[in-house]
């Protein structure tokens, strides 16, 4: 029995379109068949996923629904986990012939994490300067996909400390059922005595997926994104595909600024942490080459430094 945590990138849930439920269904229908071979080979699968566009839509609905009570960000995060989990459950059941389970996941963070003093994670819709000046939350200037300048809400992005439901997730995996969990990095919560309190923050989904993978004792950590592998000098004439990296080599490349801070860097960091915490290997690739990557024929595999 091999436990494999599969971290789905945003492109595995939504590609183009307007972000409607049907758009998400269409994308998920294209993504899920790539995992049939893994399941049939005996991999016990735990899926994690992002939730950026979905939470963005919920935040916009929050603002436009003037007659309804506003919902806090932690509740919207939980709602998005249920929404995406439902869509994945339906397609996984159809493709795998097995009924999966979605676990609404909470991720403990440290209330003294420095990220709370420096919110940097942009979420939600864009505002013009006048709209931004009226908001009661911090905003930062940025550009949208078309290069237009605007302002977006920013929230802290603290590091995950512990996955509250990890034990329950492992129990489900041991039954042979696919599990969907830690959506959007999980709902960030802080400990308050014996209680947990949700906070307005967003946890990096890859770091949270790694934390879960380590907590449940996963053998493999499969990080899926929109490129087929990790590259040296990515996007240049000298780019070089890397089929294998030791944790030491990957850490050196991170320190040299080889990877984009908002894209590949957190994925590589998560892979290093997983392997250094006892995992067998971590792999970065795209959904279409997931099986080949586990066979060593595609993607980038991160292995212990002494191998």
Swiss-Prot record:
Keyword terms of this UniProt record: Arginine metabolism, ATP-binding, Cytoplasm, Kinase, Nucleotide-binding, Plasmid, Transferase
Pathway where this protein functions: Metabolic intermediate metabolism; carbamoyl phosphate degradation; CO(2) and NH(3) from carbamoyl phosphate: step 1/1
One GO CC term, this protein: cytosol
Catalytic activity: hydrogencarbonate + NH4(+) + ATP = carbamoyl phosphate + ADP + H2O + H(+)
Source organism superkingdom: Archaea
Claim: Cytoplasm is one of the keywords in the record: yes
Enzyme Commission designation: 2.7.2.2
Top-rank EC class of the record's enzyme: transferase
InterPro entries named in the record: AceGlu_kinase-like_sf (IPR036393), Asp/Glu/Uridylate_kinase (IPR001048), Carb_kinase (IPR003964)
A molecular function GO annotation: ATP binding
Location in the cell: Cytoplasm
Any one of the GO BP annotations: arginine deiminase pathway
Induction (free text): 20-fold induction in fermentatively grown cells.
PANTHER family assigned to the protein according to its UniProt record, in alphabetical order: CARBAMATE KINASE (PTHR30409), CARBAMATE KINASE-RELATED (PTHR30409:SF1)
Role description: Carbamate kinase involved in the arginine deiminase pathway of fermentative arginine utilization.
Family membership noted in the UniProt record: Belongs to the carbamate kinase family.
Protein name: Carbamate kinase
Gene transcribed to yield this protein: arcC
């Amino acid at each position: 029995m091999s436990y494999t945590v599969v971290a789905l990138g945003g492109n595995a849930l939504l590609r183009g379109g307007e972000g409607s439920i049907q758009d998400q269904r269409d994308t998920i229908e294209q993504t899920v068949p790539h995992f049939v071979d893994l399941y049939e080979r005996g991999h016990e699968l735990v899926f994690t996923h992002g939730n950026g566009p979905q939470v963005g839509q919920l935040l916009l609905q929050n603002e436009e629904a003037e007659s309804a009570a506003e919902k806090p960000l932690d509740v919207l995060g939980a709602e998005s986990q249920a929404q995406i989990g439902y869509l994945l459950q339906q397609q996984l059941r159809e493709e795998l012939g097995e009924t999966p389970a979605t676990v609404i996941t909470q991720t403990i963070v440290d209330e003294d994490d420095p990220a709370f003093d420096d919110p940097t994670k942009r979420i939600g819709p864009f505002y013009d300067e006048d709209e931004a000046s009226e908001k009661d939350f911090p905003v930062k200037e940025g550009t949208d996909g078309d290069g237009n300048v605007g302002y977006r809400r920013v929230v802290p992005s603290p590091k995950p400390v512990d996955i509250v439901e990890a034990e329950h997730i492992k129990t489900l995996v041991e039954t042979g059922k696919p599990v969907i969990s830690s959506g959007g990095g999980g709902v960030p919560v802080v400990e308050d005595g014996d209680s947990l309190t949700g906070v307005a923050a967003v946890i990096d989904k890859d770091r949270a997926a790694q934390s879960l993978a380590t907590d449940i004792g996963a053998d493999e950590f499969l990080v899926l994104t929109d490129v087929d592998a990790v590259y040296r000098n990515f996007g240049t004439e000298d780019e070089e595909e890397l089929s294998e990296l030791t944790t030491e080599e990957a850490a050196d490349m991170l320190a040299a600024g080889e990877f984009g801070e908002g894209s590949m860097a957190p994925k590589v960091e998560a892979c290093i942490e997983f392997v250094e915490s006892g995992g067998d290997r971590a792999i970065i690739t795209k959904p279409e080459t997931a099986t080949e990557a586990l066979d060593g024929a595609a993607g980038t595999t991160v292995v212990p430094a002494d191998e």
